[in-house]
């Protein structure tokens, strides 16, 4: 059959046995990829520093998804939080990877079996003997089973009734761990950042799915609806399935990019909006202010800021800073973070505290401008020194570090002050190792950015696929010129309009 590449799937259009076979093979490929990718990531993952070199800095993609569902231990003897363990149990990272690979192999064998034994009795209509599927009944079965799985996940896995729970953290991504979650049945369950909504929504959606599945198993669709929506056509199934997938892809692209309880920043990295809004900076200043109110010194107050919190407040961890087509992990970009140098506080010769204006997300370069507490520009690094009025040299700017590795160190020479002012544009200042991975200094995106871009792109493609296949199945008679409900035997070429004896073709 000389089919073009874009029409090869027509070979399984009227062959339910082999249609099932190719779908099982597809599942084998998906599960095989997931298991293999997990093993690859585990081979290259360095768990030694969960604070400054977490999974998202290393470009891990499947490890965060396993972790958010409750997997934290490795057969290598390490724990995702940085500790060591002696008894990881079967459901470690490697155990999950192995389960996917074994499942993939079983699906591979099942696909071959169904390809060879395609002509099963279950696929044929007992009245006509032709291949036929009761699609509304199959829909009911699948909806019931999906509802059961959804309910079970929410009621048992997430709640810890029979399972580990899910990854839960505080709003600043500091205390994350796997723990059971109680369902949130009030209005708070609709807050995308409340983990309890994950449990309650799965329980509610699962219950609805079970009831809807039973409904579709026990009630047949009306004839007019069945014919109007072409429920007997397998391409209707394809169209509606694509709709479900693209809708889900758009939703998860949103929850990933804007953040939610299901995409913790400890596993996927911070969102760009946390940089844009100064989210971590405000919390750091709040903590320092609270420390100063308790009569702590600047040095003491800044030394109590967790390194993890300071690291989030660095533009290199903003997923929108990496170009879409810059391959590699964040560590391959600006390097592996080694330590926090501390918070620089700039002052002019009159003793005013100055603040460096931070670089907005979508700038590659940005002028170095220092403002006072009222937002008045007091110093800058000028483009043309001949016309400068606020240069570091003229204003006499000095810098002193509080907290971190340079705690208590101050600099007054203009070259060093300007160096740290430039670095302060990018948030908190960190020492970065660019030698180990030969990092090129160009920012990369985090798995949060890749996931969003991939799912938004495929959702758009699948949206068009839904329109395409939906219109094909709804207007099949128009496209083919054949009434799908035509029962009488017709002779091709005998009539101007197929099957219409009033327009018999004129013999020339």
Swiss-Prot record:
It is a multi-pass membrane protein. GO terms for cellular component: chloroplast thylakoid membrane; photosystem II. It is found in: Plastid, Chloroplast thylakoid membrane. This is Photosystem II CP47 reaction center protein. PANTHER family: PHOTOSYSTEM II CP43 REACTION CENTER PROTEIN, PHOTOSYSTEM II CP47 REACTION CENTER PROTEIN. GO terms for biological process: photosynthetic electron transport in photosystem II. InterPro entries: PS_antenna-like, PS_II_antenna-like_sf, PSII_PsbB. NCBIfam families: PS_II_CP47. One of the components of the core complex of photosystem II (PSII). It binds chlorophyll and helps catalyze the primary light-induced photochemical processes of PSII. PSII is a light-driven water:plastoquinone oxidoreductase, using light energy to abstract electrons from H(2)O, generating O(2) and a proton gradient subsequently used for ATP formation. Belongs to the PsbB/PsbC family. PsbB subfamily. It holds the Pfam family PSII. Its main location: plastid. One of its GO terms (molecular function) is electron transporter, transferring electrons within the cyclic electron transport pathway of photosynthesis activity. It comes from Lotus japonicus (Lotus corniculatus var. japonicus). Gene3D superfamilies: Photosystem II CP47 reaction center protein. Keywords: Chlorophyll, Chloroplast, Chromophore, Membrane, Photosynthesis, Photosystem II, Plastid, Thylakoid, Transmembrane, Transmembrane helix. The keyword Disulfide bond does not apply. Binds multiple chlorophylls. PSII binds additional chlorophylls, carotenoids and specific lipids. The lineage of its organism: Eukaryota, Viridiplantae, Streptophyta, Embryophyta, Tracheophyta. PSII is composed of 1 copy each of membrane proteins PsbA, PsbB, PsbC, PsbD, PsbE, PsbF, PsbH, PsbI, PsbJ, PsbK, PsbL, PsbM, PsbT, PsbX, PsbY, PsbZ, Psb30/Ycf12, at least 3 peripheral proteins of the oxygen-evolving complex and a large number of cofactors. It forms dimeric complexes. The keyword DNA-binding does not apply. The chain crosses the membrane at residues 21-36, 101-115, 140-156, 203-218, 237-252, 457-472. It comes from the Eukaryota.
């Amino acid at each position: 059959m000389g089919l073009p590449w874009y029409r090869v799937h027509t070979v399984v259009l009227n062959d339910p046995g082999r249609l099932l076979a190719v779908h099982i093979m597809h599942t084998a490929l998906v599960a095989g990829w997931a298991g293999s990718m997990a093993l690859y990531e585990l081979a290259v993952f360095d768990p030694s520093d969960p604070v400054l070199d977490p999974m998202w800095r290393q470009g891990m993609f499947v490890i965060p998804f396993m972790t958010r569902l409750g997997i934290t231990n490795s057969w290598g003897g390490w724990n995702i939080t940085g500790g060591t363990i002696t008894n990881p149990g079967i459901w470690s990272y490697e155990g999950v990877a192995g389960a996917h690979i074994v499942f993939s192999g079983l699906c591979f064998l099942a696909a071959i079996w169904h390809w060879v034994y395609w002509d099963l009795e279950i696929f044929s209509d007992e009245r006509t003997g032709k291949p036929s599927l009761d699609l509304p009944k199959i829909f009911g079965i699948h909806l019931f089973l999906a509802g059961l799985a959804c309910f079970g996940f929410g009621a048992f896995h997430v709640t810890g009734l029979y399972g580990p729970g899910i990854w839960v953290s505080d709003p600043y991504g500091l205390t994350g761990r796997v723990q059971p979650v109680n369902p949130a049945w009030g209005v708070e369950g609709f807050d995308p950042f409340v983990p309890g909504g994950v449990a309650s929504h799965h329980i509610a959606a699962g219950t609805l799915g079970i009831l809807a599945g039973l409904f579709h198993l026990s009630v047949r669709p009306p004839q007019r609806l069945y014919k109007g929506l072409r429920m007997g056509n397998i391409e209707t199934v394809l169209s509606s399935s694509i709709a479900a997938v693209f809708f889900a892809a758009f939703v998860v692209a949103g929850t990933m990019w804007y953040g939610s309880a299901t995409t913790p920043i400890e596993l996927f990295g911070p969102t760009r909006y946390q940089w844009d809004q100064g989210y971590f900076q405000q919390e750091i200043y709040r903590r320092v202010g609270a420390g100063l109110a308790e009569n702590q010194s600047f040095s003491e107050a800044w030394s109590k800021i967790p390194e993890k919190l300071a690291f989030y407040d660095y533009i290199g961890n903003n997923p929108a800073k990496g170009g879409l087509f810059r391959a590699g992990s964040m560590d391959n970009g600006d390097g592996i973070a080694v330590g926090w140098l501390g918070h620089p506080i700039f002052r002019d010769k009159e003793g005013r505290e100055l603040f460096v204006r931070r670089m907005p997300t979508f700038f590659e370069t940005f002028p170095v401008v220092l403002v006072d507490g009222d937002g008045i520009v007091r110093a800058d690094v000028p483009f043309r020194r001949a016309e400068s009025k606020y240069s570091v040299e003229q204003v006499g700017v000095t810098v002193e570090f509080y907290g971190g590795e340079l705690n208590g160190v101050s600099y007054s020479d203009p070259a060093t002050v300007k160096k740290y002012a430039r670095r302060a544009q990018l948030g908190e200042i960190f020492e970065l190792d660019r030698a180990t991975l030969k990092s090129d200094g160009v920012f990369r995106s985090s798995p949060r950015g890749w996931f969003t871009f991939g799912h938004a792109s495929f959702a758009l493609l699948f949206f068009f696929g839904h329109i395409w296949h939906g219109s094909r199945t709804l207007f099949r008679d128009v496209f083919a010129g054949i009434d799908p409900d035509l029962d009488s035997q017709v002779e091709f070429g005998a009539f101007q309009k197929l099957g219409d004896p009033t327009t018999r073709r004129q013999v020339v």
